[in-house]
C-alpha cells in the first residue's frame, strides 16, 4: 500500500479512535508539563491551498507534510538537517558539520515530542505517559549510545551531566528570573510536592555517583587494600540497576497512584492564541502516519547525533575548547533549546508548575534513567563505564541539586532566586572553561587536568 494512501486512511480513523479513548474536545485529557512546554512552540499553519489539489492521495501526503513540518515555530531550522547531511558527503569542514548538526537537532527534538503526543491519543494515558517518558530525552539517549559505541566515555558522562546541570540551573534559573521580572508585582506560587519528589530522586542519584568516587579514592589511598580495583565498576552497575528500579517506581507513582501531583493546572485563555495549549485536544495525524514520521524523525536524530559525536574533537581543537566544556555546556544548551524555550514561555505566563515539571522532570529522567541505562548498555558492550564522574563533576552535581532544593522549598518564586541559579550555572561553566583534560578518551579511568592560564 502506498505511503500516501496509508496516511489518508489513517487520518480518517483518527477521530474514531479518539472517540474510543474519550479524547475529543470537551473531554479532559491529561497532558504532562513536557507536552505543554513543547506545545508552546507550535503554531497553526494555513492549509487552505491543499483543498485545491485534485489527487486525494497527494492531498493527504501534503497535509501530513504540512502538519509535521510547518506547524512549529522552529520550521526555519529544518534546512540545517539537509545542510548537515550535505556537508558530510561533500566533505566540508568537520566544524561546519558539528554546528549544522547541533542546529538541526533543535527542531527534530521538538517534533519527536509532538509525534509521541500524537501517538498517545490512541494508546491511552498510561502507555502515552510511558512514551513521553521514553522519548522525553531521546536526543541525550542517542548521543550517549553513539558515543559509547565509539568508546568516548568522557563525552557520555559530560553530556549527561551537562543536561542535568542545564535543567536545574540554567533553565529553571532563567525561567524564575524572567518570570519574576515579567510578574514583578504578582505572586508566583508553585506546588512544592512535585519539587520534593524530584529532588529526593536527584539526591539518590548523586549518592549513587558519590559512592563509586569515594570507593576509588579509598582503594587508591590504601585504606581498603583488600578491595579489588574493579570494585567501583561493580558498585556502579549494581547502583544502576537500583536506580532503574527507583525510576520505574517513580513512573508508577507519577502515572498511577499520585498522578494529581504531576498534572499542571489548566492553562487559562490568553490573548495569544498560540499559547492556548488546553485547546489542542484533537489529533491531527493518524496512528500509522504518526508512527512513520516518528521512525523517520528518530533516524534523522540518530544520524545527526552521530555527526555530533564524530566531529566533537574537531570542534574542540578548532575552537580551542575542551571536549568536557563542549559536552557539559554547549551540547545541552543547543540540544534542549526547544524544550527550554517552552519552559521559559510558560514561566513568563506565570505557569510555574509547568516550568518546574519540565526542568526538574528532565533532570530526574536523565539522572535516574538515561545515566543508568548508559552504564548497563556499556556493560553489555564490554565497556567499563561507571558512575564515577570524577570529583569536580560530582561535586558540581551535588551542589547544583542542593542549591535547587533550597531555592524551591518555600513554594513561591521571585527573580532573585532565578538570578542565583543562573549565576551558579555561570560559575560552573567558567570552571569547566578553564580546565583541559589530557586524556580525551577517558577509557582508562585516569583523568589529568590542566588549567588554562
Curated annotation (Swiss-Prot):
UniProt region (Cation selection), positions on chain: 136-171, 335-370
GO CC aspect terms: plant-type vacuole membrane
Tissue: Expressed in embryo and roots.
Transmembrane segments: 68-85, 92-109, 127-147, 161-181, 195-215, 233-253, 284-304, 328-348, 365-385, 389-409, 415-435
Main localization of the protein described in the UniProt heading: membrane
Cytoplasmic side: 1-67, 110-126, 182-194, 254-283, 349-364, 410-414
Keyword Electron transport attached: no
Cellular localization per UniProt: Vacuole membrane
The keyword Transmembrane helix is annotated on this UniProt entry: yes
BP GO terms, sorted: calcium ion transmembrane transport; intracellular calcium ion homeostasis
Domain of life: Eukaryota
Membrane topology: Multi-pass membrane protein
Stretches in topological domain Extracellular: 86-91, 148-160, 216-232, 305-327, 386-388, 436-453
Molecular function as annotated in GO: calcium:proton antiporter activity
InterPro entries (UniProt xref): CaH_exchang, CAX-like, NaCa_Exmemb, NCX_ion-bd_dom_sf
UniProt KW keywords: Antiport, Calcium, Calcium transport, Ion transport, Membrane, Transmembrane, Transmembrane helix, Transport, Vacuole
Function summary: Vacuolar cation/proton exchanger (CAX). Translocates Ca(2+) and other metal ions into vacuoles using the proton gradient formed by H(+)-ATPase and H(+)-pyrophosphatase.
Record-stated family: Belongs to the Ca(2+):cation antiporter (CaCA) (TC 2.A.19) family. Cation/proton exchanger (CAX) subfamily.
Protein name (database record): Vacuolar cation/proton exchanger 1b
Provenance organism: Oryza sativa subsp. japonica
Amino acid at each position: 500500500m502506498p505511503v500516501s494512501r496509508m496516511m489518508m486512511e489513517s487520518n480518517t480513523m483518527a477521530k474514531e479512535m479518539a472517540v474510543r479513548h474519550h479524547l475529543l474536545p470537551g473531554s479532559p485529557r491529561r497532558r504532562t508539563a513536557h507536552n505543554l512546554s513543547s506545545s508552546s512552540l507550535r503554531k497553526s499553519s494555513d492549509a487552505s491551498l491543499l483543498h485545491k489539489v485534485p489527487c486525494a492521495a497527494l492531498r493527504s501526503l501534503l497535509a501530513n507534510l504540512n502538519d509535521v513540518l510547518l506547524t512549529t515555530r522552529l520550521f526555519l531550522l529544518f534546512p540545517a538537517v539537509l545542510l548537515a547531511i550535505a556537508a558530510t558527503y561533500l566533505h566540508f569542514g568537520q566544524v561546519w558539520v558539528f554546528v549544522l548538526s547541533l542546529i538541526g537537532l533543535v527542531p527534530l527534538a521538538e517534533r519527536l515530542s509532538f509525534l509521541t503526543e500524537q501517538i498517545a491519543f490512541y494508546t491511552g494515558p498510561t502507555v502515552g505517559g510511558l512514551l513521553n517518558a521514553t522519548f522525553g530525552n531521546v536526543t541525550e539517549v542517542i548521543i550517549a549510545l553513539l558515543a559509547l559505541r565509539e568508546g568516548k566515555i568522557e563525552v557520555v558522562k559530560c553530556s549527561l551531566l551537562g543536561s542535568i546541570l542545564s535543567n536545574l540551573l540554567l533553565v529553571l534559573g532563567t525561567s524564575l528570573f524572567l518570570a519574576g521580572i515579567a510578574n514583578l508585582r504578582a505572586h508566583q506560587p508553585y506546588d512544592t510536592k512535585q519539587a520534593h519528589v524530584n529532588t529526593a530522586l536527584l539526591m539518590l542519584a548523586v549518592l549513587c555517583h558519590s559512592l563509586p568516587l569515594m570507593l576509588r579514592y579509598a582503594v587508591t589511598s590504601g585504606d581498603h587494600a583488600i578491595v579489588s580495583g574493579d570494585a567501583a565498576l561493580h558498585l556502579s552497575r549494581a547502583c544502576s540497576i537500583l536506580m532503574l528500579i527507583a525510576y520505574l517506581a517513580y513512573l508508577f507513582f507519577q502515572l498511577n497512584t499520585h498522578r494529581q501531583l504531576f498534572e499542571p493546572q489548566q492553562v487559562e485563555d490568553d490573548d495569544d492564541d498560540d499559547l492556548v495549549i488546553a485547546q489542542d485536544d484533537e489529533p491531527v495525524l493518524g496512528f500509522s502516519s504518526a508512527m512513520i514520521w516518528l521512525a523517520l524523525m528518530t533516524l534523522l536524530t540518530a544520524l545527526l547525533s552521530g555527526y555530533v559525536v564524530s566531529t566533537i574533537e574537531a570542534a574542540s581543537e578548532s575552537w580551542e575548547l575542551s571536549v568536557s566544556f563542549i559536552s557539559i555546556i554547549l551540547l545541552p544548551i543547543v540540544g534542549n533549546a526547544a524544550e527550554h524555550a517552552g519552559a521559559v514561555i510558560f514561566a513568563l505566563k506565570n505557569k510555574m508548575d509547568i516550568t518546574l515539571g519540565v526542568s526538574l522532570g528532565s533532570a530526574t529522567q536523565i539522572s535516574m534513567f538515561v545515566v543508568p541505562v548508559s552504564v548497563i548498555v556499556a556493560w553489555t558492550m564490554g565497556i567499563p563505564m561507571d558512575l564515577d564522574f570524577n570529583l569536580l563533576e560530582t561535586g558540581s552535581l551535588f551542589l547544583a541539586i542542593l542549591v535547587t532544593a533550597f531555592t524551591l522549598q518555600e513554594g513561591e518564586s521571585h527573580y532573585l532566586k532565578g538570578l542565583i541559579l543562573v549565576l551558579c550555572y555561570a560559575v560552573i561553566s567558567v570552571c569547566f572553561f578553564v580546565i583541559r583534560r589530557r586524556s580525551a578518551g577517558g577509557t582508562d579511568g585516569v583523568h589529568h587536568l590542566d588549567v588554562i592560564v
